[in-house]
């Protein structure tokens, strides 16, 4: 059983970027979905996975030349080689590691500990050295509470000076003199507001715990961030405070009124988030700086954005007065807000420098990747804060958490057709160019497995999952459903259908819209659409809602705003028809030649006609149950009683009815849809598979099959309808046919597959965690294989089975697996 994973196995906990090697590392937490591990991503599909020595979560992650350093929740300090892609050494120090700092020019990594000491680890000899820095804060303040090291940072221009951030304050340590040079103790006197949200705490002296400590890019100043949301700028020469401020207020270390964030109710206040992360950035000139801050905002606001203080050129320290220095930080040249999605909070960030790694990776950054508390990622241009799409910018696996995926589908597409589908889009410089792709065998004659994934922000991405072979076209396609619908919220996609042969795609939303896209050249490049309402119950032309930066790709074509509940079934055929079913029970058939709606009805109408002629007794309770389409499929075959073949639409419902519609051309070139009949099955219909009666070959409505209708071709076909509890093969529309009932387990998804030259079979995923194959038409079990150890059984209904026996299913919230169940189970 071949397995290929896509995505991130668990919640992301750490991000690290190396601008020299152009690589990005991602660490994850240990969870029920998988162990903590490290992913290293490079250009295109370059990816390696580094497992931790023991089950744990990644807490700290840093690049150091050709090595990757990691500290995990088990207190293991692990050193990985990027060259050999393996673990070099794992060491568990005698004290808990709380901070890590390294430099590519040094052979040592500095480890800050929970007891306040700093240890040195020799990366070449792979062992701890004798050198250690004692708890300097405890030596200076013997009565202080237990202090641990929070941050470590070498002076940007003097490797002999180390800034140690304890949770009680900061210290500059000199390696040359082997002693502490200056202590930075942030003490708020009585009456000083500080960054506190609680007005009662103003009337007592306090020392807010430290969370961050960083150098100015030239080492001229020191900046500390605190739990009470204070930002304090210090003079490293004499240890005095130059400016203490919050995101909104200044001089908060001096007695005064201050401002407090009101709570939800009168007389209450809102707590503020601590300062999670600080980056003191510089342009090409290291004296032209700005401060990027994550955190420090009231907890009751929905959008907790990043804040960037654009300071401009730093005053010359030796010739500037104290007032000039203080006002430089009190009144920045510009205050920028880098927006984040509502209801989220940034807990960590990773800057992407333009060219070099200097100044802790903060010189001339062009982008920032932010980690949210949920484990999702967002990427923004810097310093403008404009969203950057991860499509063809970040690695494919990272897009599954950017943001999370809420629906997945897969469609086989002919190879040459997919090779021609390369979108042209205006895009910034790529910042992942490292690594070298591995060589895989080239399967030229296989249809490509094209995955469609919809994300929480309304973005749909298409990409080739392959067959564990060489990916010739590894680029992703992107569709902005939110822009096509005309709004930014309430854009959850519930169904996607991709017609590869026609280069068309349809997306169905929970809000009840169906949006159709078609490949083409954008005639509205660089233009913003005119806001207008969508027509209810009719088709709306949305050609002008194409993305402004997209020159060629999948463009919006038309939209149906049904407004009758979420889309529950959707099928986009290769021959210009789209069928959509809604939870309210309605069914719509769209002919894209107009485009026009050629059929619109409720499933209850044609189900009633079947009940009138039925001898079965039905209670009033079952009659009143809501019914809606759950499965749709187009086919070309001869109906029972006809002497010609035609295009058919089969509709399966949640109550087990299978209706058939006939699509016939009119004189003007348009088509009409007419109801033919309905058959009642025992359970919810999960799959409809039209096949040739003599061979079992699929009889879908392909372009070749429809073209053959002009020549009078007749297809003797049958329909295999699969329900949760059984399957039935019958001649549409009302022939009873033969039935098979599953013995003990319910079926979640199924389809017709072909194994090499051995013929066709029905392959399904079942509730006991097995994939089973059944012969056609006898419906006898051929074999079974356990897949629950690879895929999540609870999400089997969301899995997709292809005609070649590939199964794409979920492993976790942001990880999928593509497996092929055919083979001999022998390792080569």
Give the role of each language-model region.
Residues 1-2:
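Eukaryotic N-terminal targeting leaders
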Residues 9-43, 55-83, 96-131, 138-181, ...:
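Eukaryotic assembly scaffold/adaptor repeat-domain signature, activating on surface loops/turns
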Residues 51:
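A phosphate-binding glycine/aspartate-rich beta-alpha loop in the early core of alpha/beta enzymes
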Residues 90-91:
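Membrane-proximal extracytoplasmic
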């Amino acid at each position: 059983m071949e397995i290929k994973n896509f995505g991130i196995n668990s919640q992301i906990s750490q991000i690290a970027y190396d601008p020299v090697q152009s690589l990005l590392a991602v660490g994850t937490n240990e969870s029920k979905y998988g162990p903590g591990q490290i992913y290293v991503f490079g250009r295109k599909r370059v990816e390696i996975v580094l497992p931790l020595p023991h089950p744990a979560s990644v807490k700290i992650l840093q690049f150091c030349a050709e090595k990757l350093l990691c500290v995990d929740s088990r207190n293991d300090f692990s050193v990985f080689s990027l060259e050999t892609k393996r673990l070099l050494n794992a060491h568990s120090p005698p004290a808990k590691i709380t901070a890590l700092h390294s430099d590519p020019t040094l052979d040592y990594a500095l480890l800050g500990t929970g007891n306040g000491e700093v240890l040195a680890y020799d990366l070449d000899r792979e062992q701890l050295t004798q050198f250690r820095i004692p708890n300097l804060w405890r030596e200076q303040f013997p009565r202080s509470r237990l202090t641990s090291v929070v941050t470590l940072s070498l002076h940007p221009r003097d490797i002999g000076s180390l800034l140690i951030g304890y949770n009680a304050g900061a210290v500059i340590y000199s390696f040359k003199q082997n002693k502490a040079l200056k202590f930075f103790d942030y003490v708020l006197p009585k009456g000083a507001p500080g960054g506190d949200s609680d007005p009662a705490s103003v009337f007592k002296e306090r020392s807010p715990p430290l969370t961050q400590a960083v150098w100015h890019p030239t080492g001229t100043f020191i900046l500390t961030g605190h739990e009470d949301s204070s930002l304090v700028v210090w003079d490293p020469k004499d240890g005095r405070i130059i400016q203490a401020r919050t995101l909104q207020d200044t001089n908060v270390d001096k007695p005064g009124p201050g401002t407090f964030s009101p709570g939800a109710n009168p007389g209450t206040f809102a707590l503020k988030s601590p300062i999670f992360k600080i980056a003191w950035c510089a342009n090409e000139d290291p004296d032209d700086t700005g401060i990027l801050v994550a955190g420090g905002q009231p907890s009751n606001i929905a959008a907790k954005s990043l804040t960037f203080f654009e300071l401009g050129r730093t005053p010359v320290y030796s010739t500037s007065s104290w007032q000039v220095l203080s006002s430089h930080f009190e009144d920045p040249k510009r205050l920028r807000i880098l927006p984040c999605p509502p209801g989220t909070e940034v807990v960590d960030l990773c800057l992407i420098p333009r060219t070099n790694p200097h100044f802790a990776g903060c010189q001339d950054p062009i982008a920032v990747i932010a980690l949210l508390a949920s484990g999702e990622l967002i990427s923004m241009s810097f310093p403008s804060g404009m969203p950057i799409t991860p499509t063809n910018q970040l690695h494919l696996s990272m897009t599954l958490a950017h943001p999370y995926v809420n629906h997945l589908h897969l469609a086989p597409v002919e190879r040459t057709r997919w090779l021609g589908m390369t979108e042209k889009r205006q895009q910034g410089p790529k910042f992942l160019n490292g690594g070298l792709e591995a060589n895989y065998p080239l399967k030229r004659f296989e249809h490509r497995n094209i995955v469609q994934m919809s994300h929480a922000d309304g973005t749909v991405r298409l990409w080739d999952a392959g067959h564990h072979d060489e990916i010739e076209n590894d680029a992703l396609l992107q569709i902005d459903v939110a822009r096509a619908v005309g709004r930014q919220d309430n854009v959850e996609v519930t169904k996607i259908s991709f017609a590869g042969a026609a280069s068309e795609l349809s997306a169905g939303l929970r809000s009840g819209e169906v949006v159709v896209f078609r490949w083409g050249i954008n005639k509205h490049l660089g233009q913003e659409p005119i806001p207008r309402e969508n027509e209810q119950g009719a088709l709306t032309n949305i050609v002008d809602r194409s993305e402004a930066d997209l020159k060629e790709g999948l463009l919006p074509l038309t939209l149906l705003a049904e407004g009758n509940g979420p889309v529950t079934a959707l099928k986009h055929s290769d021959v210009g028809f789209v069928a959509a079913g809604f939870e309210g029970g309605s069914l719509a058939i769209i002919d894209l030649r107009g485009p026009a709606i050629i059929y619109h009805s409720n499933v209850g109408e044609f189900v009633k006609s079947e009940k009138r002629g039925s001898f079965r007794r039905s209670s009033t309770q079952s009659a009143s149950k809501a019914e809606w389409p759950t499965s749709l499929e187009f086919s070309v075959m001869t109906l029972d009683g006809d002497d010609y073949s035609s295009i058919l639409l089969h509709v399966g419902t949640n109550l087990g009815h299978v209706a058939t519609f006939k699509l016939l051309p009119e004189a003007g070139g348009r088509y009409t849809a007419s109801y033919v009949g309905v058959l009642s099955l025992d359970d919810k219909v999960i799959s409809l598979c039209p096949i040739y009666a003599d061979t079992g070959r699929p009889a879908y409505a392909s372009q070749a099959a429809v073209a053959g209708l002009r020549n009078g071709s007749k297809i003797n076909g049958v329909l295999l309808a699969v329900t949760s509890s059984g399957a039935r093969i019958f001649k549409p529309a009302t022939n009873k046919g033969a039935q098979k009932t599953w013995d003990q387990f319910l079926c979640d998804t199924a389809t017709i597959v072909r194994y090499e030259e051995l013929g066709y079979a029905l392959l399904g995923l079942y509730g006991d965690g097995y994939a089973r194959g059944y012969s056609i038409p006898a419906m006898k079990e051929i074999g079974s294989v356990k897949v629950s150890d690879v895929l999540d059984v609870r999400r089997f209904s969301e899995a997709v089975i292809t005609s070649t026996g590939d199964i794409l299913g979920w492993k976790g919230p942001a990880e999928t697996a593509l497996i092929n169940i055919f083979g001999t189970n022998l390792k080569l």
